[in-house]
Amino acid sequence: MRHIISAPPHVDVSATVAELAKAQGLSVQSDPSRKICEAYGYQTIYEMPLELQKRARRQLIETHIEALQQRDQVVCDHSVFTWLADWMRWLWSETPAEEWEAVLDLSRPAIPLYGTIHHIADGKLAAYDGYRWLDRRNGVQIERLLRHLYTDFGCNERVVFSHT
């Protein structure tokens, strides 16, 4: 069974991930965002020039789907929903409708691979790691977008809502 964590970036999901992994004997798939940014020579995705940022975001989605296809007993500390919500929050005005539809189409294969989606709305503030945007107000906006994405992708019945 695949367990997917979907949470705003300011929320520390590590305890939930560890509990799920231990209780169900699952391996942990960590968010590849930092590695992908560093591979392009950047600390965060937000520093990248626009087109490179879009390419990196697509690469995150592709990498995530490939990892899911290789492992079925896993808990992921990330989801396509979080990346899509972040894209909507920060790049909406720079993404034409046709391009956004292509991004959604790229993301769609992840959804049937998801088992339980653990939506963590709020909780303990994540420690600064030099990568994530930890502003709570931004997190509230991302969290609202996550809920819309579950509906758009037709997977509300697999979402479990909780707090850390």
Spans of features found by a protein language model:
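Glycine-rich phosphate-binding P-loop
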Residues: 3-21
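Conserved substrate/cofactor phosphate-moiety recognition/catalytic segment
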Residues: 18, 22-65
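Short His-Asn-centered micro-motif
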Residues: 6-8, 76-78, 120, 162-163
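Glycine-rich phosphate-binding loop used to anchor ATP phosphates in small-molecule kinases
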Residues: 53-112
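Short loop/turn segments at strand-loop or loop-helix junctions that form parts
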Residues: 32, 77-81, 85-86, 119-124
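Short glycine-/acidic-enriched loop or helix-start segments at secondary-structure transitions
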Residues: 15, 85-87, 128-130
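A glycine- and Lys/Arg-enriched "phosphate-lid" helix/loop adjacent to the NTP-binding pocket
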Residues: 90-163
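Structural motif
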Residues: 2, 73-74, 116
